[in-house]
């Protein structure tokens, strides 16, 4: 028996060394309707339980709002029994997740850095180095530290003139949300090269702290091994790695005993053993706190669902400026809709689902950055986290338009100078 365990461990190590990728053949995604509190409780419990193997692409929130669940083949019978025993109704949304993964990237991409495919961690870092060298008059390389696996967390400060107020963009804190990082690099390029007068105005009237990948370990792992990896890669448990960095911030953090996060290290919403236990979040917070006089807006980029959320996620209590945050969000959503008709919904975060220890609750509640928003990019669920690369540019275009609307309305209401 001991020999078997040793040999199995060696095989696993060799598999990781040669870059064997996890496959998701015949993994299915179902949309499950939630009609009563008993059904909702089962889904909450299922999301938080150890080794459940179910991946909630759209989380349980409240009665009347459906969830999306990825079900592995070996759980198909169990899933069917859960659906039957509690009279759930469900529909098959994605019959084979691996097919979407195989089709996510173009078959014959052009050479050079462009926005026709999703780029690896190394390629993004190389591109950041290149554009800093090419635009050293307005770009400064910045870093807020190192990840658990000693990956430098690199970004840029874009500044056309001294004294500008600043906007901070945090992206790819959830590593499987590839569209977030691709959109962020596109925005950097547009801020540098666009001749559109509205883009030029927001690029040059504000300083921009931009970090395309704030969870580099997870992002690298999502390319090399497990496309659906969400968390960091830290070790707090013998069997399961990582914590959800967007449940790990130290404002109203909770240990996972409530509905806003999990205390199970194997859960995708594991809050970590303590606030800021993750290097990626603690160092980010320190970076922001050192610049709170400068940073006037904080944006957190995610996917999917086509939403724009503002604080709070941990409580139903409204921010004192909730009406303005809603109005600014609606102005952003209206501008976003114009290029392609994409309809974003604007919410207080808690009205969608309870999420404790998230970044925008911390920036608003602890760092005092009133204009704190989280985007959930395309799509509405057809592809989920596996948005085809041919949607990178359309998504980026509409997000840029939303930033124009958001900044214009924030200025009009007196929240930006």
Task: Map each language-model feature to its residues.
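M14 metallocarboxypeptidase catalytic domain recognition
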Residues: 2-7, 13-417
């Amino acid at each position: 028996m001991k020999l078997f365990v040793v040999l199995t461990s060696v095989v696993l190590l060799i598999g990781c060394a040669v870059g064997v990728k996890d496959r998701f053949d015949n993994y299915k995604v179902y949309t499950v309707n939630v009609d009563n509190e008993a059904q909702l409780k089962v889904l909450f419990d299922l999301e938080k339980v150890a080794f459940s193997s179910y991946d909630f692409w759209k989380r349980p929130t409240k009665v009347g709002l459906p969830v999306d669940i990825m079900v592995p083949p070996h759980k198909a019978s169990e899933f069917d029994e859960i659906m039957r025993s509690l009279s759930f109704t469900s529909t098959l949304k994605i019959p084979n997740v691996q097919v979407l993964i195989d089709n996510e990237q173009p078959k014959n991409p052009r050479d050079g850095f462009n926005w026709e495919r999703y780029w690896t961690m190394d390629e993004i870092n190389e591109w950041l180095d290149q554009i800093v060298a090419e635009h050293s008059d307005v770009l400064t390389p910045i870093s807020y530290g190192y990840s658990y696996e000693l990956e430098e967390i690199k970004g840029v400060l874009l500044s056309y003139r001294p004294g500008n107020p600043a906007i901070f963009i945090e992206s790819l804190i959830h590593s499987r949300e590839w569209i977030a990082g691709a959109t962020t690099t596109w925005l950097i390029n547009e801020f540098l090269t666009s001749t559109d007068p509205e883009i030029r105005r927001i690029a040059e009237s504000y300083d921009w702290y931009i970090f395309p990948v704030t969870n580099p370990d997870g992002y690298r792992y999502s390319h090399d091994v497990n496309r659906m990896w969400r968390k960091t890669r830290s070790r707090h448990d013998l069997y399961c790695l990582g914590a959800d960095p967007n449940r790990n911030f130290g404002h109203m953090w909770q240990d996972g005993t409530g509905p806003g996060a999990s205390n199970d290290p194997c859960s995708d919403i594991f809050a970590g053993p303590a606030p800021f236990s993750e290097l990626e979040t603690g160092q980010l917070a320190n970076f922001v706190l050192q610049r709170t006089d400068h940073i006037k807006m904080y944006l957190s980029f995610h996917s999917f669902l086509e939403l724009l959320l503002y604080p709070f996620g941990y409580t139903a209590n409204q921010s004192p400026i909730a009406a303005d945050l809603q109005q600014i969000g609606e102005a952003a959503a209206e501008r976003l809709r114009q290029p392609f008709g994409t309809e974003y919904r604007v919410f207080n975060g808690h009205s969608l689902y309870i999420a404790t220890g998230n970044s925008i609750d911390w920036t608003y509640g602890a760092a005092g950055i009133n204009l704190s928003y989280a985007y959930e990019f395309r799509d509405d669920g057809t592809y989920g986290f596996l948005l085809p690369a041919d949607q990178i540019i359309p998504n980026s275009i509409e997000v840029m338009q939303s930033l124009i609307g958001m900044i214009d309305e924030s200025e009009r209401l007196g929240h930006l100078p």
